[in-house]
Amino acid sequence: DCPSSGPYGPFPYVLHHGAVSGVTGSAHEWVISEQASVLIDCGLFQGRDKGPGGAGAGNLAIDFDVSRIQALVLTHVHIDHVGRLPWLFAAGFSGPIYCSGPSARLLPIVLEDAFRLGVSRAPARVEQFLKLLEERLVPLPYDHWHDLDLQGGVKAEVRLQRAGHILGSAFVECRRQGSHITVFSGDLGAADAPILPPPSSPEEADVLVIESTYGDRLHEGREARQARLEAMLVRALKDRGTVLIPAFSIGRTQELLYELEDILHRNRQSAMHDFLDWSALPIVLDSPLASRFT
């Protein structure tokens, strides 16, 4: 029989290897037994954020034992959740990588860019890494339990549910022995996002590991955000000025383009803004990576 507890308490339990005292470097180990665990995300550290083992933006080598980690589940493909995969491979991880179908399509693009910037630009090494990555990717549908083929005689399943953060994002429900459920939220989106369905809610959870990137900040609604954006554009048109908007390549950029198109479409047909030439407002997306995603 498998022991019912380990050095940190009864199974299952969670070890946090990143995004503990900061918001980047997400890596959470769901420990199922002495022989088996599943890693949820393996992200890049940014700024001054560090992991409990000392890893940080200047030292991305994996600083935790990977010998019992038999699978990796990704919540979404932002770099602070997936950026350390090259170092995870180098540390000896050789298991499957589970994620949603859209994430499986986006992940090689994200990591090709990250690999060239952080590891090597040599075409042969980039191609070798991407081949290894794609061999291990296992796309999962939303809202279906998937059995994990783990050693150690313990039954474990995962289920992805929509998180509404970016295309392909999910929160992960992890179930041990058909009963105990641990939920990892990943990053959660807003209920009124313009191009994505709202996040689902978990049916039940014995343990909930939830992000708190924005703390207790109250976010304004979509209408208020769009009104502020439109006011900036009107001012730029009047002054013949420029609006510069920094945005993540995946998610924010596409939402901005959608909102800009909506504003332009409405105002081209509005008598209120006849004195403004909306056709004279060029929109320039200055990001090769964002262009590929879009």
Locate predicted features.
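Short, conserved secondary-structure transition motifs
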Residues: G251-R252, L276-T294
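His/Asp/Glu-rich metal-coordinating catalytic cores
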Residues: G6-V73, H78-V82, W87-E255, E261-L276
